[in-house]
Design a protein with these regions (language model features):
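Alpha-helical transmembrane segments of multipass membrane proteins
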Residues: 9-14, 28-32, 102-103, 145, ...
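Residues that define the loop-to-transmembrane-helix transition and helix capping
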Residues: 20, 91-92, 134, 168
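Transmembrane helix-bundle signature of multi-pass membrane transporters/permeases
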Residues: 98, 102-103, 137-146, 174-179
Length: 189
């Protein structure tokens, strides 16, 4: 069995097949050779039972909401309001980045979407205010991580579905730490 495994794996890698695809093909080949259970039926059952969960319907809606906020200009107006609210703080624009990331995280549910949206909106402010680009982008990257913690979080939904944990309890468990983390980010700036 080991000889067949290594031969198939090395053959796929020699053909310049990507490692992930090679391991997937290797798993299929080995399951057909050595397993009595049909793997294709098991894959179909797992995919169907996972996608048939009504809680996962929320994920595309969070993505759509984030896109609506960006395309409609609401994210830009939110960021502009935050820029006007915190200029009295030292590093006011950095605090605007973190606060905007926290507010957008509360609507999008995704760290990547939060960092990308606020980064897109905020990039024009670097030249206007003369901040260090490293520090400016660092606050956006740090604030973007709030998207996974501040509810509603896509990762919390997926975790709750997979572990059969109450999603409202996960949301309650993430809210206070998210606010504390945003406050600590602002304190660090």
């Amino acid at each position: 069995m080991l000889a067949v495994t290594l031969t198939v794996l090395l053959g796929l890698l020699a053909l310049a097949v990507p490692v992930a695809a090679g391991l997937g093909v290797l798993g299929l080949v080995l399951s057909e050779l050595y397993s009595k259970l049909p793997l294709t039926l098991a894959i179909g059952e797992i995919a169907w039972s996972t996608s048939n969960n009504f809680l996962l319907v929320a994920i595309p809606f969070f993505v759509m909401l984030g896109e609506i906020l960006l395309r409609s200009g609401i994210a830009e107006r939110m960021y502009g309001a935050l820029v006007l609210w915190v200029p009295w703080l030292p590093g006011g624009l950095m605090h605007s980045n973190i606060a905007a990331c926290a507010m957008f995280a509360a609507t999008s549910g995704s760290s990547v979407a939060t960092a990308a949206t606020i980064g897109t909106v905020a990039m024009g402010e670097i030249e206007k205010h003369g901040y260090s680009e490293r520090l400016f982008l660092g606050t956006i990257a740090a604030g973007g991580t709030l998207g996974i913690l501040i509810p509603p979080s896509i990762n919390m939904i997926v975790y709750g579905v997979l572990t059969e944990t109450s999603i409202p309890q996960l949301y309650l468990a993430g809210f206070i730490p998210g606010i504390i983390l945003a406050s600590l980010f602002s304190l660090t700036v």
